[in-house]
Amino acid sequence: MSDAGVEEVDPSRWVEITRENPDHSSWYVERFRTMAAAGDDLDGESRFVDAMVARRARILDAGCGPGRVGSALARAGHEVVGVDVDPVLIAAAEQDHPGPRWLVGDLAELDLPARGITEGFDAIVCAGNVMPFLAPSTRVTVLERFRRHLRPGGRIAVGFGAGREYDFDEFLADAERAGLDAGVLLESWDLRPFTHASEFLVAILTP
């Protein structure tokens, strides 16, 4: 408990990494700027989510980083809010991708109505290996908070790779504990079917 009597959440692995290496966030930003300048295809996740929703949908980019996914969805005509725990990444998103609303915040404490964003979302996208970077103690809480921010009929798209100290079966069990059904499982953002040999998981979750 904090001095104010409010229970504190464990810091994410990303927070721990950036505490140990303060230059890590800037390196991450420049890495994706370089890839974008080289013409690399960075829009696989955004194409996937765009196909899930109607035009002018409300989309939450959860763990948005420097805004790669959310900005592409905004260019496609959607109303995007992006949240990330790292202020360096949010500053880069604001600089490189004006338009969406970019917010600093811990996903384990996600409460957008308290920040004046009262309308729910048609889709939540959590890409870029965000889930394995969470503190293990907060994973179910984060998924529960995602569920609470959905509009009726809304869906959550989560993607992350194997070998990151978060087994796919464990994630699916956490989703169930959070009141979510993983009705669609894929091994990539380009709709390849998931198998037990898959090294990547894309899960579509619904309440």
Segments and roles (model prediction):
Residues 112-123:
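A short acidic, Gly/Pro-enriched loop at the edge of an enzyme's catalytic core
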Residues 122-137:
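A short SAM/SAH-binding and catalytic strip from SAM-dependent methyltransferases
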